[in-house]
């Protein structure tokens, strides 16, 4: 989930880049994006916006669930206390990189499923494509099958249903 826009976000807030590197990014990014668009690339930029409360819930869910704890890095825990700085960095990044040729589209993302579906729908509305939905299919009745002798279930090995 990392991108070169991290220069203006994580790297800025966490001190991983110099002021000169940040300024270079802010100047070069829109120039590069314009070049891509002039070259015929459809450039779509999406920002999945999560509220402070939702982010806190997601952090807590990761802490509470051992199978998801790996998703929570020490960097996440440090960044958690810098929510306001990250918000300001995002606003500054938008100010420098939200250009008419390649605007940012914000996706309300507190609900992951809705966010993904809304983003997919929006993306498809921005990219020309041919509808390739196959025609409807009607299943004909199956012909009668001859009797089949199957081995007894108690002679087979099954993976336990740990998640019924």
Pin down the residues of each PLM region.
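Anionic group-transfer/hydrolysis microenvironments
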Residues: 3-4, 47, 51, 110
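Short, active-site-adjacent cap segments at secondary-structure transitions
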Residues: 6, 53-55, 113-115
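A glycine- and Lys/Arg-enriched "phosphate-lid" helix/loop adjacent to the NTP-binding pocket
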Residues: 9-28, 36-88, 135-139
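NTP-dependent small-molecule kinase module
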Residues: 88-91, 95-164
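Beta-rich strand-turn-strand
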Residues: 1-2, 6-10
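A structural signal for short, well-ordered beta-strand segments and their strand-loop junctions
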Residues: 1, 43-47, 106
């Amino acid at each position: 989930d990392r991108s070169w826009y991290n220069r203006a976000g994580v790297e800025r807030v966490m001190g991983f880049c110099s002021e000169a590197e940040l300024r270079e990014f802010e100047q070069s990014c829109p120039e590069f994006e314009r070049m891509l668009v002039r070259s015929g690339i459809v450039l779509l930029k999406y920002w999945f916006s999560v509220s402070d409360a939702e982010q806190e819930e997601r952090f807590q869910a990761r802490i509470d669930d051992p199978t998801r704890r790996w998703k929570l890095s020490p960097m996440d825990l440090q960044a958690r206390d810098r929510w306001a700085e990250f918000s300001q960095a995002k606003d500054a990044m938008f100010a420098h990189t939200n250009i008419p040729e390649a605007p940012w589209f914000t996706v309300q993302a507190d609900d992951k499923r809705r966010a993904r579906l809304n983003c997919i729908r929006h993306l498809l509305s921005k990219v020309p494509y041919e509808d390739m939905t196959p025609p409807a299919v009607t299943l004909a009745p199956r012909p009668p099958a001859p009797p089949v002798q199957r081995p007894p279930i108690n002679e087979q090995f099954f993976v336990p249903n740990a998640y019924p």
